[in-house]
Amino acid sequence: MADPAASTLSRLKNKSKELNIQFQQILILFSQEELVRRISVSEYRDNFILKGGYLLYSLNNQSFRPTIDSDYLITKLPMKKSKIDKVINNIIKQNTQYNYVNYEIKGYEEISAQMKYDGIRVKLISKIKNTRTHINIDFATGIDYLIPKPKTRNLITILNDFENPKLLTYSIESVSSS
C-alpha cells in the first residue's frame, strides 16, 4: 500500500457515507480507537479501565457516539499532572501498525469540580495527513475496587480488518450504575 494514511482516510470517508454519519464523527471514533490500541500495548495497560460512553459504543456496536471524550478509571498511579503527562506521552508514542496517526497534547484540566471523583481531562489533537481531530480523555480516581471486577475485552473497530484493541473495562453492571 503506497500511502496507508490516505487509504485509511478514504475508507473512513466511505464508512461515514455507508453509516450516514458525519466524517468528523468517524474521525473522532477512529482517533479514540487508535488511542485505546496504544494504551493496550503500553506498559500502563493494566492501569486503565475503560468506562462510560465509549465503552458502551464498543459493546453495543453503535454506529455513532455523540461526544468527543472517552473515560477511564486509573488504578495504581498517582493522579498528578506531571505523572499523567509522562504516561500520556509514553502512550501516544507507542508503535502500532497505524503510526500515521499522530497525537499532540493540547492541555490538561482538573475535572474534580465537575465529577464525583478527582480526575484530569487531557485534551488531544489526533492528526492523520491534513486532518486534525480534537478528542478529550477523562481520567478519574476515587474507587479502588469495582464489583464485579473489571474484565478484559476485545473492543470493536470501525474498519473490520483493523486490529481490535484489548483493554480492561468496567463490567456491564458497573457501566449501568455509573
Predicted regions and their residues:
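Compositionally biased terminal segments of proteins
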Residues: 1-178
